[in-house]
């Protein structure tokens, strides 16, 4: 099975124009997985989506994946560079 980072990369790369610039990292802090998604500023709108619908869907899919893999709670953070 794919790791959480690989799964996230597949999801986000499919919706952005510059998939080669995507960076995904994870950190385990106090039993919670912090997932950081870094994308270029000009594709940030694609990741967030209208009224945050796209990022909400991404977060939901990541949470479902974590549940299926018996991973702890995942907090998703999206930033631009």
Which residues fall in each region the model found?
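RNA-contacting regions in translation and RNA-metabolism proteins
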Residues: 1-46, 56-81
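ATP phosphate-binding glycine-rich loop and adjacent ATP-lid/helix-beta elements
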Residues: 53
